[in-house]
Amino acid sequence: MDTLQKKNNLFIPFIVAVIGSALMLLTIFLPYTSATKEFAERIDSYPEAVAYSNTDIKVSDVKNVSMVQYASMYSSNSKEILHQSSVGTIYVVIVVGIGLFSLLSLIFALLKKPIPLIISDVLAFGVFTFLGWDFRDRGLMRSAYNWGIGYYLFYIGIVMALVGAVLLIVAKKKGKKQLQEN
């Protein structure tokens, strides 16, 4: 009975942490940026137009762009887009970092390991924040783009994962205290 009660006390924090961590991982595939309404209308008018000279990227490819798509575009076309061939590698590393730390968060949530979960969440958040800062610093967010659904869902996911981790810590401490009292 005590073991069943302990498992029940961990269930809700576990589910919250797993859903939050899975959401963080999912966001690297969802639109990180989305074209503004006006820019989207222009894209729809000329979907086959080339977005960047000397590339095969069409404007329809950059209407809603995920972190993975940015990394792919920048790694294969960084000289044409960013004017430096090595910069694309940096974006790949950043997106892989976000994905890796989000995956680690999911693994630690599934293993019910709240401290490593918190650490991986903080690392994922740090890399994600750096990517957002870079986009704002380069002026991308002031022009034809808004943040996409992936950007906002990442914040929801990280809050859920952190809340789940804290609740796991509390539930585990309560469970240990109850075992000591019995």
Located regions from the model:
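Compact integral membrane and secretory-pathway proteins
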Residues: 2-182
